[in-house]
Amino acid sequence: MTVRVRIAPSPTGNLHIGTARTAVFNWLFAHHHGGTFVLRVEDTDLERSKPEYTENIKTGLQWLGLHWDEGPFFQTQRLDQYKAAIQTLLDQGLAYRCYCTPAELEAMREQQKANNQAPRYDNRHRNLTEAQRAEFEAQGRKPVIRFKIDDAQQIVWQDLIRGTMTWKGSDLGGDMVIARTPEGDESFGQPLYNLAVVVDDIDMQISHVIRGEDHIANTAKQILLYEALGAAVPQFAHTPLILNQEGRKLSKRDGVTSIDDFRQMGFLPQAIANYMSLLGWTPTDSTQEIFTLEEAAKEFSLERVNKAGAKFDWDKLDWINAQYLHQMPIPALTDLLIPYLQAAGYGDYLGDRPWLESLVALVAPSLTRLADVTQETRLLFGDSITLDEKATAQLQTEGVKVILQEILQNIQASTNFTPDEAKALINQATKAHGVKKGVVMKSMRAGLMGELQGPDLMQSWVLLHQKGWDIERLNQAIASI
């Protein structure tokens, strides 16, 4: 069998983490089998679909490395195909026009609720006479097209993740609406999701439909449509939902859910793709957690996708992202960090590329996300300091002023300042004044950075010295004592 899979987002919002995870699984499956990965944009919701969302989805998939082989195809450009399918179903007596008004449908639901019955359409317009139909149209009623569902029918399929799945026609809520608001006999208005998806999958020869478990009920309905249209039914695989920490489906209420959000927070695309591949799938070597999409595709199988929901683990994502950051060449990492430093107001300090790369090399081991760079480097820009409470107290320690003054004089005499020379100055001051080395180290950190915690002191000192900022800062610190 030639494997053809698709990712079919609706452009009613930015690329969501759930859609992206589904795209990852489809991409991995296609590449494992040497198949085709198709992008289809399901934009039939004209009110909510926006071109900017389409672009966001395409950009997000490409950013993640999920390049499609065919498409994008747009449902709004395929209305004739849907209308032809609807006409086929009408001609075969498998679909019909329903003229129920919203008020009638609401009254039906209220009566069912009062009778402790599940809400469903009672198929009341399935067998209208021509006279009844003419009367409804004379009243100006706009019909919908409904597909007939036999309540007694069983729908069975072998789900590639969940095994045998069985649904009854009676579980599907009555005859299904497949198009709304037709304009006369020759036009069927707007086709709805289940009909359009089936026609698309038939025309695009989709062999496997891999999507979230929230589509299981749709699958039962769609299988009936495949059969009614005389088409082969693709194989289905329903992936587990992504859950929040409370075990509920991850939603917008949880805050960060779009790929844009993750990108702005400083996650790398390869780290997100890596992590999403593990959201529900377990590699053969369960201890392996870092791999490229290509590496994951070599062993990806739906048999190793879990049925249970996958909890989104921020700590795990941070850890994976850090692994990629720490392995990245400094020049490439510097390029990625510059926008964050510019946004933080440090743009004036970024012109010296060798110095900037040295700064990045200093803080890189401390980075978990790209956005962390502003916090990790904030004490290393400019010729002035702001002393916090602990640094102020350290500078008030007896003898510190004299120590800093002597070190300052020695710095000014240095012609090639290195970390080793910085250590030598610390050791010299320690011996000369008979104090513990820690006192001198803490005092220098306070005087150079204004705080007692931060990056490696010697490396930081050298970077500051290369700009002449260490002298200015120490003068400021000494003046405050």
Curated annotation (Swiss-Prot):
This is Glutamate--tRNA ligase. Its main location: cytoplasm. Coiled coil: none annotated. The keyword Protein biosynthesis applies. The lineage of its organism: Bacteria, Bacillati, Cyanobacteriota, Cyanophyceae, Oscillatoriophycideae. It is found in: Cytoplasm. Keywords: Aminoacyl-tRNA synthetase, ATP-binding, Cytoplasm, Ligase, Nucleotide-binding, Protein biosynthesis. Monomer. Catalyzes the attachment of glutamate to tRNA(Glu) in a two-step reaction: glutamate is first activated by ATP to form Glu-AMP and then transferred to the acceptor end of tRNA(Glu). PROSITE patterns: AA_TRNA_LIGASE_I.
